[in-house]
């Protein structure tokens, strides 16, 4: 019995150690560099932002990277996938990453040596709007995007957020004017993709506007640029000139096909954007549903498209050792709990103990907490940017494995404990079904399935609590002090 108690306790301790190890490993990824020369900003103001490697093209695709958010590593992975996907489309342009000085040096080397990007290091621009009442702190450093105007080595720059999914080559954008952007919102253009002509004059003027705190509704790059280019809505729609060597002058609105909001797809489950080429998908929604997170699919079907690009660009080799470690650990839990099934821990009490009712209530609470933890712990220790099929498989394996601990430790019936597991598996199948006519039918199907599952979850909860009470009443789990508990047929309670 002592050995079994030790085995069961060890399983939960190892689970907690995995969480600690995951947190430590992620922390190790974020060791910052030492602060570079404070005169760097002065040099940028005088000469513009220069890449350490000589420019190979006259135009560039650019994105930015900065530290200080809880999701730095995920955005680093997304940046690498964006770079590799552009490379795979054989774009006729350099790919530039505007990186803050505290981006880890190993990340910089990966971007330059493995991905072929040109990295420029910058000091973070001070955000004068961070004390606004509606300010979202995750956009604190998003004004670094303004550095794109200082990329004076290039004629045109297409500035990108990392949550863009490119479907085809978009080099025709370099023929656009001094500033071009897409109006996802009928009245407000989106800054996830825009075309600009680098200009130190414009860059200095933007910095001046930051100093005087130009009107900025959201305190981020979106609000600032919408305020700065307030007349863009009245400008003509961009049409690429037939001569691909001609660059237009002025400001233009870009067709919606260059920034297809993923939410449009979820309504019809297909693209139907007639104006302009369907070239780029953007994911401007909730941060926790960005396409690189394994749980984003099948909740949002397009997440699998992003992971398809990742699979053929940077792959998942960085996460796979940790995935395999977890899989082996979960299989070990199933084996250990199976071997420990015949005899389980028994607690003793005296009939006269005034705290008996409290002990029994606490015992039920602990049993339910173990079950709940079995479904929560695996979710948080799976590598967040792993492929969804691997992520969900590992989650289902982990939750089932950890569920066997309360099943065996508290002698619970199997079916009620794994009913949530079956419900989750069924939900995944309903959401992943490929033949829905549109997003409305899909949403109704998911809600209908959830509605049908709710009674089963409630019945399972009632069965678990009543089963625990019966076992307590029959003194299977709580034999009186001085008496031997039931040592045979523990599962035969009726």
UniProtKB/Swiss-Prot annotation:
Membrane-topology annotation of the record: Multi-pass membrane protein
Superkingdom field: Eukaryota
Parts of the chain that traverse the membrane: 4-24, 316-336, 362-382, 389-409, 410-430, 444-464
Binding site for Mn(2+): 161, 163
Cellular component, GO, one term: membrane
Gene Ontology molecular function, alphabetical: glycosyltransferase activity; metal ion binding
Names of the cofactor(s): Mn(2+)
Keyword Phosphoprotein attributed: no
Name used for this protein in its record: Putative glucuronosyltransferase PGSIP7
